[in-house]
Amino acid sequence: MNRFAYRTTGLALKALSWFSKAHVTIHGRENIPREGSLLFVVNHFTRIETLLLPYWLNSLTNLPVWSLADYELFKGALGTYLDNVGAVSTRNPDRDRLIVRSLLTGEAAWVIYPEGRMVKNKKIVEKGRYMISSAGGKHPPHTGAATLALRTEFYRQRLHRLLKEAPLEARRLLSEFKIEDGAGVLTRNTFIVPVNLTYYPIRAKENALSDLARKINDNLSDRLVEELMTEGTMLLSGVDIDMRFGRAIRIGECLTCPKIEHDIGSRQVINFDDSIASRNQMRREAIGIMQRYMDEIYGMTTVNHDHLFASMLRHIPYKNVRSDDLKRKVYLLADQCVSMNQTHYHRSLQESQLPLLTDDRFGKFREFMTLAQQTEVIAGADETLVKNRSRLTNPFDFHRIRIDNPLHVISNEVEPLEFLQRCVR
């Protein structure tokens, strides 16, 4: 890793963060362990995470923060940039060894996205199970972050035992990881820290970034245009980003299975890529840890007015909806949910919601209706609204959905919040 380039790029990221009008609110920073090796698992909705999240996390932890990024991004100037900020390609043959080594030594924290790729439609639950939708199809969340954390702690505990019982094998292991001093390895613990990022509002429109890109290249792909319109608007128009840290998972507590403990203490030579006797037990532990951090990540979604309006509109069974009825239902929903304090809410929902029933002085209903009409989810602008049900249920092109039907995305985002869904129904 080029540390000079990392620091220089960090200055550029700081400037970009200042330039952006995004407002970032941090919640739960007390959940970040002050000591230990940290692996952050984060939901992935925009390129903003790839560009700015390492800088934000570095400012909170004072640690270099490296990340695992899709191999397709490592091309041209973007690839150089990603190298400089500590990103590692998913196809790097040494990626696992690099991650485990740096977690053993604590030289860097890591960011991994368990969905594997950006989830533009925010569809991550199907029939009560986590199932990620993407342009390439559907797949369960990856267990890679859990597996890497388990392998890190496996070797940490193994070194701790072998330095006393089989020092030659311990020294061989340290040499394999290119670690000169094992003392720093033994005193650390490995933690997975779940992180949720919620963006509000989600709006896509032409902006300075998309205009500039068109002037440079008038043959942009639809995918790039969509990303510039959606994420450029977020950065330049002032999106609220709630960054919420969940309870850290101490990985050492997940290695107590007798078969795993036997492998940890084995005096036989175990190379990094060797299959071990307890691999099935390790795999089961990885799946369990993945379920824990997925529950934590998506349980921390910060609910906002768009979530309530979109969810209520989707669940109302009638095609024709009176606007006053919709406002009353959302007012009661907000009052019930916030008072019971079962999930997290945007700061605008912490205040009195009476304006929804009176003059809509903060424009929450008006802004939602404008978006619904522009994207043809709703027709009519007076007392009776005509709902286009297909716009809230039918699938859309993965790389166009944030432009063509953001309300579908918004309602998908809160599907994992069972308490909210019960209140909506």
Locate the predicted segments by residue.
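Membrane-interfacial terminal anchoring regions of lipid-handling membrane enzymes
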Residues: 1-66, 70-74, 80-83, 91-425
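The substrate-binding groove and active-site-proximal loops of carbohydrate-active enzymes
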Residues: 88
